[in-house]
Regions:
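Active-site microenvironment for binding and transforming phosphate-containing groups
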Residues: 10, 15-255
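Methionine residue identity
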Residues: 1-5
Length: 256
């Protein structure tokens, strides 16, 4: 995968309210590969037990983009043909179960800004011009609204409140993790919907692992300032070359 050109998308959709929903929990940590109509995507088994939502993490398979964008590119800002990107959204939506005009896309700038999304935001950044910026997290309780965030190697965070029928998605790179955007998202859901953190179902999506994530000391200093010393040995280790290997997955688990 060309991480500079092909953008993967995290999709989470609030479906119609189902008032008799029961709480589900699972120890399942691995995503499953799904394929429909030639489109390949990933899902979480624990979320598939929830009739109130649909979700996916896209792959590069099943789209119409060509060359370095081949084939399921979902970014309008990388130089790909706009009509190809629109067709990719149509194909992904047909496979997963959403309409492109219901999608609300983030404008990720490594902040901890979390936006409350309403029905008036449908299509934002997808089928109509974007009306908000500097947004790395989104939450909603509006049925039919689709949240979309974008990734190369940063960490996708899913949030589902099956009690108050609400969802959230957040983009957590190292800056967002230091800023604890996961915690910010949960607090925002509590503020807006009355969500109880103990009742939330959360997940960490596909992203860079510790073995592949080398950082310099200035980044580690940020984590040392943000996290209690008792967690440091779980978050990073120093190598002989003076660099560090950083574990963003574990950092976000600690935040949750």
């Amino acid at each position: 995968m060309n991480m500079q050109m092909l953008v993967r998308v995290h999709i989470l959709k609030h479906k119609e309210n189902i008032m008799d929903i029961k709480w589900h929990s699972s120890d399942e940590t691995h995503m499953q590969v799904r394929e429909k109509n030639g489109v390949t995507f990933l899902t979480y088994p624990a979320f598939e037990n929830l009739p109130e939502i649909i979700h996916c993490f896209s792959t590069r398979l099943g789209g119409v983009s060509e060359g370095i964008f081949s084939s399921m590119n979902l970014s309008f800002t990388r130089g790909d043909n706009e009509n190809a990107v629109k067709e990719n959204y149509r194909r992904l939506g047909a496979a997963v179960g959403f309409a492109p005009e219901d999608v609300v896309s983030s404008d990720q700038t490594h902040t901890t800004n979390v936006r409350l999304v309403g029905a008036e935001d449908r299509g934002n950044g997808i089928t109509r011009p974007r009306t908000f910026h500097d947004t790395d997290g989104m939450i909603t309780n509006v049925p039919g609204v689709v949240l979309a965030t974008y990734y190369a190697d940063c960490v996708p965070l899913y949030f589902v409140d099956p009690v108050h029928h609400a969802i959230g998605l957040s983009h957590s790179g190292w800056r967002g993790t230091v800023g604890k955007i996961g915690k910010v998202t949960i607090e925002k859901m509590h503020q807006e919907f009355g969500s109880d953190p103990a009742e939330l179902l959360t997940a960490i999506g596909p992203s860079i692992c510790q073995d592949c994530y080398e950082v310099s000391e200035d980044v580690i200093l940020e984590f040392q300032n943000a996290f209690n010393e008792k967690y440091w040995n779980r978050l990073f280790y120093k190598k002989d070359n003076g660099k560090y290997q950083l574990n963003l997955w574990e950092a976000n688990r600690i935040i949750f």
